[in-house]
Amino acid sequence: MKLFWLLFTIGFCWAQYSSNTQQGRTSIVHLFEWRWVDIALECERYLAPKGFGGVQVSPPNENVAIHNPFRPWWERYQPVSYKLCTRSGNEDEFRNMVTRCNNVGVRIYVDAVINHMCGNAVSAGTSSTCGSYFNPGSRDFPAVPYSGWDFNDGKCKTGSGDIENYNDATQVRDCRLSGLLDLALGKDYVRSKIAEYMNHLIDIGVAGFRIDASKHMWPGDIKAILDKLHNLNSNWFPEGSKPFIYQEVIDLGGEPIKSSDYFGNGRVTEFKYGAKLGTVIRKWNGEKMSYLKNWGEGWGFMPSDRALVFVDNHDNQRGHGAGGASILTFWDARLYKMAVGFMLAHPYGFTRVMSSYRWPRYFENGKDVNDWVGPPNDNGVTKEVTINPDTTCGNDWVCEHRWRQIRNMVNFRNVVDGQPFTNWYDNGSNQVAFGRGNRGFIVFNNDDWTFSLTLQTGLPAGTYCDVISGDKINGNCTGIKIYVSDDGKAHFSISNSAEDPFIAIHAESKL
């Protein structure tokens, strides 16, 4: 009995680390600021057939409607209530999206903003996405309801009431992040209101949560909230399934708060990943791709089974958050595709792909003065994601997840899932290759000269279609063909001026 109980508790503890994606689906995509109606369509027409596991959606709860600057993306991170009512859509549209996505095997992960309410400087009134009244000055949020008792004003010891020193773990948790009213998560009432919101989402059918600003909450307070959560909806998930949890903790080293403080609750965002990979692929600070041989824990990252990884996210692609100038984004398309390709081929971590919108970037003294700009809109109403004849998106939606090179690497990861990291090659510089057991092989040329070499792929003999330069369609290849001989070797030739200086082949791209 003791052994059974031990196994049961371990099983229970492990649940929040597994993604709840359908078998054979290994990545999620952040459809940043998309409307629920567009996400529902995208699940059906694209994400499900292309092998995506799920979608991270923008915060679905009511927020402040900010008009100066006009409707910025960050207003979504200033809650007013837990009503499902935002510029992405209302509760009916949200339910419809979750149902339709789940029905085609694509999961929904909610960005949960639970550390705080809106900023202390916002004026009282009903300028909110559902018209709820709120008064930050008197700490009054009747639509929840929260009042003065439910905030950390009395607990914070800094003069301003805001976080002033990141080397003081207590003020990082108990004071206001950039003036955002800090909820008293130590109170059972507050925990219960948050759990009620999250349980409402679980009952609708979501598969898990990104926990925003986790660094600014005590790990024990997060745990107390998670302990109140329901199991997932058994219409779509096995009986007893727990929500997937990944916590946003920016830990680049050098601060008292560590990612590992949060492992007991679930996975954690590994911000070192994109910052370092960007530096390597840009070849800054003497970094080379050959150094990626021991990528992952060997670079001082958290354990693979605790990491949620990404090349860029909605914050750092516009200079917010962490990582600085090394972060690669869709603006750096050629290098970005290589970085995302490397991430999706490498076994480390659980992978999230970014899907962005364009904004009028304008740098003054090294800072993008338009880093606040919200999604494509007509006078504040978010524009539809239109699909062009060539399958790209219109209306200033970037849709990196639809770029052939990225979409095909999402599938590559599915095909090689569970296979070991094998057959590493490097030239001591920026030409590298590696395989995933006998299921996949990828080659990169990030040097300033041509790559031409015969390598051991570990794959069965045959003709393979390179899924970077083309697609396998009806048994034919629209891109480069790679011939693997009986001994598993193949010749690769990649010009340094190629549109995409990398090649990837896998078991399902065999002709």
From Swiss-Prot:
What positions are modified (Pyrrolidone carboxylic acid)? Answer: 16
Query: What glycosylation sites does the entry record?
Result: 427, 476
**For this protein, what does the record note about how its cofactor is bound?**
Binds 1 Ca(2+) ion per subunit. Binds 1 Cl(-) ion per subunit.
Instruction: Name the positions where Ca(2+) binds.
Output: 115, 173, 182, 216
Reactions catalysed, as given in the entry: Endohydrolysis of (1->4)-alpha-D-glucosidic linkages in polysaccharides containing three or more (1->4)-alpha-linked D-glucose units
Question: Which GO terms of the molecular function aspect are on file?
Answer: alpha-amylase activity; calcium ion binding; chloride ion binding
InterPro entries listed in its UniProt record: A-amylase/branching_C, A-amylase_C, Alpha_amylase, Glyco_hydro_13_cat_dom, Glyco_hydro_b, Glycoside_hydrolase_SF
The protein's site described by Transition state stabilizer is found at 315
- What Pfam families would the database entry show? Alpha-amylase, Alpha-amylase_C
Q: Where is the signal peptide?
A: 1-15
Q: How does it assemble?
A: Monomer.
Q: What is this protein called?
A: Alpha-amylase 1A
Source species of the chain: Homo sapiens
